[in-house]
């Protein structure tokens, strides 16, 4: 008996931060703030789409760093251990999932896109992710506006 299909959005955190101009600008002076802005955006996206969000930040060049996993609302934030890239974590994670799961990986790294496609996931570029986020926000606003209008009419 197979389990229920799950929908995932896996985000290569620093790759997306460096691809989005507004986050890249913030990261120059405050990397933590840029991470939080990305986390907030993915929380909102995951709430709207129902996807399980996973953001992976690598600690590849940080000495003596242990893997840290943090849960926030409907997403998981992963800080990889020393010498582990976000790419290797993402590849291993995808390999652990069921073939029935729907997995999207957000990265601009072409080599990583090819690897995740080979593992059965789909890829989404930083630009496509940004457009999806903007569309989700627009639909949330529309939904809230129509709900507000219904309340006013009653």
Predicted stretch roles:
Residues 2-11, 15-154:
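Nuclease catalytic cores that cleave nucleic-acid phosphodiester bonds
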